[in-house]
Design a protein with these regions (language model features):
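Conserved "HGTGT" condensation-loop signature of ketosynthase/thiolase-family condensing enzymes
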Residues: 3-189, 195, 200-202, 209-348
């Protein structure tokens, strides 16, 4: 009997086991609570870190897209003029569109100051005149060879431009092969290069095209030539702009809103130089003026020179009126590019 009682657990043993079980349960519950608290705090920390990372990436993206390009000296040649005064008259609609000419069975708008008629020879002469007129109209500041050169046009026209530059402005040594102008992509490269360049460094942007008249064409054939020296500073500034690709399905109004944010503007500029493009009605509904500064009647079809031409007109407008001016044109790598030129006092 005594042996059987010894084998049975005492009441003290049962109490100890119960206490141990309760203590173990409390430890496990506390550990679980601590793990849950730690997980929660880590989740909150990770969420905050992710938000900070996203905000940093957005800041970096905007900093890159807001890098300014200063337009220092420039020239625009076309059927309606070759001086800033001419283009201000065009922008203010104080000058009637040029008379169309019959050319090879088609219609054309031609610059009256060029006497050569054959297209290739005319384009070569236009490239040469671009240099000579720039030298005649430009300031007296000392020039240095540009960091980079961008050219919109044929190689033959570039060689004529380069040869004339050597004769007329000897200190402007130009490369035998320039970088091809690629619209917004080139503006992005220029902005990045100038951000890391010395204050006196410049980038040359130029182009020239004579479009051959075609029978039955919707628009008369036109011609245009542009030259700009870009640097870190200048009377007017622009950013790289934004691109719209119809195939991606993005709304043009969303792209336009991004351009305003890029330039830190609360609303569209009063003026926007452009050529007609399909689908611009959506911009009109969001406050952009797509009619008053349309350039089709003044230039005709100028091919790949549309972008540089409207950019030049926007720069002339911004410098004279001291107000932002938009520009919109076809882009070599996208459907459209849209941007804004601002006077120096409104620099980002």
């Amino acid at each position: 009997v005594y042996k059987r009682q010894a084998l049975l657990p005492s009441s003290e043993g049962k109490s100890a086991l119960a206490a141990t079980g309760i203590l173990l349960a409390l430890v496990l519950a506390g550990t679980g609570w601590l793990i849950r608290l730690l997980y929660y705090r880590m989740s909150v920390h990770n969420a905050r870190f992710y938000d900070q990372l996203v905000a940093y990436e957005q800041q970096q993206w905007w900093a890159e897209h807001r890098q300014p390009i200063g337009l220092q000296e420039g020239l625009l040649l076309g059927p309606m003029g070759k001086t800033t005064t001419d283009w201000l008259r065009v922008l203010s609609r104080h000058q009637r569109p040029p008379e169309e000419e019959n050319e090879g069975g088609g219609r054309a708008l031609r610059a009256p100051y060029l006497s050569v008629s054959e297209a290739i020879a005319r384009e070569k002469r236009l490239a040469e005149l671009l240099v000579m007129e720039w030298q005649r109209q430009r300031s007296e500041r000392t020039l240095t060879p540009p960091l980079r050169c961008y050219w919109q046009g044929t190689e033959l026209a570039w060689q004529a431009f380069r040869a004339q530059m050597t004769l007329t402005v000897a200190q402007m040594t130009l490369p035998s092969r320039p970088d091809a102008w690629r619209g917004e992509a080139s503006l992005a490269e220029i902005a990045h290069a100038l951000a890391e360049a010395d204050p006196h460094d410049t980038v040359l942007i130029a182009g020239c095209q004579v479009v051959v008249a075609q029978p039955g064409a919707v628009q008369p054939a036109g011609e245009s030539a542009v030259l700009w020296l870009a640097g870190r500073d200048g009377p007017v500034h622009l950013t790289r702009g934004e691109t719209y690709c119809a195939e991606k399905g993005e709304a043009l109004t969303a792209v336009a809103a991004r351009v305003l944010e890029q330039n830190e503007l609360s609303g569209p500029p009063e003026a926007c130089a452009l050529f007609f493009q399909p689908g611009l009605e959506a911009l009109a509904h969001s406050g952009w003026d797509i009619n008053l500064y349309r350039q089709d009647a003044c230039w005709g079809d100028i091919g790949e020179m549309e972008g540089l031409t409207v950019l030049s007109l926007a720069a002339i407008y911004a410098a004279h009126y001291q107000q932002p001016c938009g520009w919109l044109a076809r882009d070599p790598l996208n459907t459209l590019a849209i941007g804004i030129v601002k006077p120096d006092g409104q620099r980002q």
